[in-house]
């Protein structure tokens, strides 16, 4: 039975929706007929006016009858024009009312749609979702920190290695400065000494080494002063 009542209800709603459209169609049809009558009466008025002018000097009775018919047509034309104006106003009023009704129906549908959407959402659900997002973001941050700290632990740097590397770098810079000034390292000077007796070689090597060291120290002091 509900389906039957729904069918009848649906037809009733459709009829209510079609009522203004049918009314507008009927009014426009009547307006079209009146506009045709307006043109016909205007032609009749022009025709009777021409007859009256034609017979005004030769046949006054005919001219008078033509003028009488002209007045009758003019009266009918005035009525027709009044009816046309009334119909046009009525059509505009129904069209405006129909637009208002359709606008209201559209707004009702929009309100129902928003009600359906908000019916599935509550402040508690939104807060719960946001809490879950914050928890997951915090968990992700903890995971990243754990991975990063683990990598840093596996790549621990020995301070002794750093000291050795710094000493090597300082030695390289010192060698470069010596090469630029034309004075070779002490070890190279010893290797270039001529062959001699063991005792003499040791004595000369010691003397050369001391002289070279003093010269090197003076050169470094001079460079530092600059």
From Swiss-Prot:
Residues that span the membrane, as ranges: none
Disulfide topology: none
Main location per the UniProt record: cytoplasm
Coiled-coil features, chain-numbered ranges: 24-226
Keyword Cytoplasm (UniProt): yes
Entry annotated with the keyword S-adenosyl-L-methionine: no
Stretches for region Disordered: 197-216
An example Gene Ontology molecular-function term: identical protein binding
Function: Required for the sorting and concentration of proteins resulting in the entry of these proteins into the invaginating vesicles of the multivesicular body (MVB). Also required for the proteolytic cleavage of the transcription factor RIM101 in response to alkaline ambient pH.
Subunit text: A component of the endosomal sorting required for transport complex III (ESCRT-III).
Similarity section: Belongs to the SNF7 family.
Protein name: Vacuolar-sorting protein SNF7
């Amino acid at each position: 039975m509900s389906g039957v009542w729904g069918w009848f209800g649906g037809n009733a709603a459709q009829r209510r929706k079609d009522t203004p459209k049918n009314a507008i169609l009927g009014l426009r049809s009547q307006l079209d007929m009146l506009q045709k009558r307006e043109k016909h009466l205007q032609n009749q008025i022009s025709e009777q006016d021409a007859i009256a002018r034609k017979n005004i000097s030769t046949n006054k009775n005919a001219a008078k009858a033509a003028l009488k018919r002209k007045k009758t047509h003019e009266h009918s034309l005035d009525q027709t024009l009044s009816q046309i104006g009334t119909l046009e106003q009525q059509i505009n009023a129904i069209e405006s009312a129909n637009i208002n009704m359709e606008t209201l129906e559209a707004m009702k549908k929009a309100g129902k749609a928003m009600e359906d959407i908000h019916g599935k959402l509550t402040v508690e659900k939104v807060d719960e979702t946001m809490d879950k997002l914050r928890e997951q973001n915090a968990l992700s941050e903890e995971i990243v920190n754990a991975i990063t700290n683990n990598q840093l632990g596996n790549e621990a740097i020995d301070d002794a290695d750093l000291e050795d590397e710094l000493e090597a770098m300082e030695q390289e810079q010192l060698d470069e400065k010596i090469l630029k000034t034309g004075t070779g390292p002490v070890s190279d000077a010893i290797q270039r000494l001529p062959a001699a007796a063991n005792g003499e070689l040791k004595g000369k090597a010691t003397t050369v080494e001391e002289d070279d060291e003093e010269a090197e120290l003076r050169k470094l002091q001079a460079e530092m002063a600059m």
